[in-house]
Regions:
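Glycine-rich phosphate-binding loop signature in dinucleotide/nucleotide-binding domains
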Residues: 76-82
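The beta1-alpha1 cofactor-binding region of Rossmann-like NAD(H)/NADP(H)-dependent oxidoreductases
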Residues: 42-43, 60-73, 104
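Canonical Rossmann dinucleotide-binding motif of NAD(H)/NADP(H)-dependent dehydrogenases/reductases
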Residues: 3-35
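Conserved mid-core segment of classical short-chain dehydrogenase/reductases
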Residues: 93-106
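Structural signature of beta-strand start/N-cap positions in the alpha/beta core
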Residues: 10, 34, 58, 82-84
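Rossmann-fold scaffold of SDR-type NAD(P)-dependent oxidoreductases
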Residues: 14-15, 83-91
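Conserved glycine-rich Rossmann-like NAD(P)H-binding loop of the short-chain dehydrogenase/reductase
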Residues: 31-47
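Short, conserved SAM-binding/catalytic segment
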Residues: 48-54
Length: 106
């Protein structure tokens, strides 16, 4: 029994091609969501798509350290779909302060 019904929901998962993000993607797909992976490694994305076997999984190559790239891709998706879920899972190396202390450009 699945009490986690996401039928007709659209989710974006950053860093969704592997690790914890990929586990989230699989759970969302199993629960009926349409999922878009945002990741920078096409090799891992292709493997994730192949492993899922789901027609409800798509991807965009997105560098989440680039604000303009995030905005462009988010606007592209939201012009066609209502985004119901956004999981900000991807990690960014090199931050030495609290994330809210950084301007968008960083």
């Amino acid at each position: 029994m699945n009490n986690f019904d996401l039928n007709n929901r659209v989710a974006i998962v950053t860093g969704g091609a592997q690790g914890f993000g990929h586990a989230i993607v699989k759970r969302f797909l199993d629960s009926g969501a349409k999922v878009i992976i945002w990741d920078i490694d096409k090799k891992f994305i292709e493997k994730a798509i192949e492993d899922s076997g789901s027609k409800n999984l798509s991807y965009q190559i997105v560098d989440i350290t680039n604000y303009n790239e995030i905005k462009k891709n988010f606007d592209e998706i939201s012009s066609k779909n209502k985004i119901d879920i956004f999981v900000n899972n991807a990690g960014v190396a090199g931050l030495n302060d609290k994330v809210w202390n950084y301007p968008n450009e960083e």
